[in-house]
């Protein structure tokens, strides 16, 4: 068969499928995102993913292993030194990250906070890991009274700055975040993203606005997306994909509100005539349920995703390729609130499969990028091995 005209890549953010061989190095022995969610739910109901071979990769309670899976399947091990969103996604597109982005479970160093205060002329309050909505309830009034900046982080490598739009105008908020971005380029901080988190409203009824702005790092090298764009292929980035790559290699960015909207936008974008990559990240699994250690919410979100998947599959043309994977784990039964170092599932589907098979375990997420590059006949990434011939 000929090569594929369109590749649809769905990253189920944080949907790991069992501890990686090096889990001990990351304090993640025993982590199993999908397995533990299924146990907690007394079985997951995901008939579509079951038919694609999900439980053939590793037994998952409630999901039957398929005698005749419709898709090729295996699992992938992360090669880079990290377990965060940016590391996982950058590796998928052909990079290898040696130095992990830093996380700040105890807040940011005093030295950084003092520099930020000095350069912005405003005091900092908060400086700890927190939920964005909860920290507004806790510190919003104080911020309005004093004009201090609410600085907080999460389990990811992010520095977030929240400010009321009537207290600190948007332009000043963005300027403050640019200062923070500049300061955190220093290797001793190496923060993945600085995020402006503007809000409005009164105490007890604060509301974050759509004026959020991300100041990411550019990928540390050229990705497969850069090669696609430079060779006049389309790269549609859905959800937070454009932010993760700081817009590099993106020809069109489509924002999404949540997982449900992500699947709606994906479905709509399938009506477009394009040649290249359509890349969607479904962040709710991670942000709403993994970090908050909510296995039931996570399980229900997985089941909803599974319900929406048939519509996507039905819309695939004969020269379309669908790849479903993840970027790391986030086991909601595991200790702490951080990501977990796990294998991730890899499911590869197209309409022309006559006999689906188990693929060899991938030693790097970059095999996906290599396969996409191979398909479109562009420069292969330095890392990764194409499995294109195995799936035709």
Swiss-Prot record:
Binding annotation for Mn(2+) 1: 13, 327-328
Keyword Manganese: yes
GO CC term (a single one): cytosol
UniProt EC number: 5.4.2.7
Keywords: Cytoplasm, Isomerase, Manganese, Metal-binding
GO terms under biological process: 2-deoxyribose 1-phosphate catabolic process; 5-phosphoribose 1-diphosphate biosynthetic process; metabolic compound salvage; nucleotide metabolic process
MF GO annotations: magnesium ion binding; manganese ion binding; phosphopentomutase activity
InterPro entries assigned to the protein according to its UniProt record, in alphabetical order: Alkaline_phosphatase_core_sf (IPR017850), DeoB (IPR010045), Metalloenzyme (IPR006124), Phosphopentomutase_DeoB_cap_sf (IPR024052)
Physiological role: Isomerase that catalyzes the conversion of deoxy-ribose 1-phosphate (dRib-1-P) and ribose 1-phosphate (Rib-1-P) to deoxy-ribose 5-phosphate (dRib-5-P) and ribose 5-phosphate (Rib-5-P), respectively.
Family membership noted in the UniProt record: Belongs to the phosphopentomutase family.
Protein name: Phosphopentomutase
Provenance organism: Oceanobacillus iheyensis (strain DSM 14371 / CIP 107618 / JCM 11309 / KCTC 3954 / HTE831)
Annotated gene: deoB
């Amino acid at each position: 068969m000929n090569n594929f005209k369109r590749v649809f890549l769905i990253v189920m953010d944080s949907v790991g499928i069992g501890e990686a061989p090096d889990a001990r190095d990351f304090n993640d022995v025993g982590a199993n995102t999908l397995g533990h969610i299924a146990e907690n739910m007394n079985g997951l109901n995901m008939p579509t993913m079951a038919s694609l071979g999900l439980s053939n990769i590793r037994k998952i309670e409630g999901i039957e292993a398929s005698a005749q899976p419709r898709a090729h399947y295996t699992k992938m091990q992360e090669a880079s030194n990290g377990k965060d969103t940016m590391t996982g996604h950058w590796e998928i597109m052909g990079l290898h990250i040696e130095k992990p982005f830093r996380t700040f479970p105890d807040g940011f160093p005093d030295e950084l906070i003092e520099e930020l205060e000095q350069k912005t002329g405003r005091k900092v309050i908060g400086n700890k890991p927190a939920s964005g909505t909860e920290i507004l309830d806790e510190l919003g009034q104080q911020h309005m009274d004093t004009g201090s900046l609410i600085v907080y982080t999460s389990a990811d490598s992010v520095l977030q700055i929240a400010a009321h739009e009537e207290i600190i105008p948007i332009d000043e908020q963005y300027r403050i975040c640019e200062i923070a971005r500049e300061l955190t380029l220093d290797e001793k901080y190496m923060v993945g993203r600085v995020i402006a988190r503007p809000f409005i409203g009164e105490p007890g009824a604060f509301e974050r606005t759509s004026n959020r702005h991300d100041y990411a790092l550019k990928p540390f090298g050229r990705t497969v997306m850069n090669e696609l764009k430079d060779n006049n292929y389309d790269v549609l980035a859905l959800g937070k994909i454009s932010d993760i790559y700081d817009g590099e290699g993106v020809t069109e960015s489509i924002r999404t509100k949540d997982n449900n909207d992500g699947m709606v936008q994906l479905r709509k974008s399938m009506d477009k005539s394009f040649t290249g990559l359509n890349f969607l990240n479904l962040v709710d699994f991670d942000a709403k349920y993994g970090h908050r250690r909510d296995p039931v919410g996570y399980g229900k979100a997985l089941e909803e995703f599974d319900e929406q998947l048939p519509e996507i599959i039905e819309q695939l043309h004969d020269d379309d390729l669908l790849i479903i994977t993840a970027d790391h784990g986030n086991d909601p039964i595991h200790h702490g609130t951080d990501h977990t170092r796990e294998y991730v599932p890899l499911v590869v589907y197209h309409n022309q499969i006559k006999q689906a098979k188990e693929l060899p375990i991938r030693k790097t997420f970059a095999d996906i990028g290599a396969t996409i590059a191979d398909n479109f006949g562009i420069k292969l990434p330095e890392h990764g091995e194409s499995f294109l011939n195995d799936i035709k």
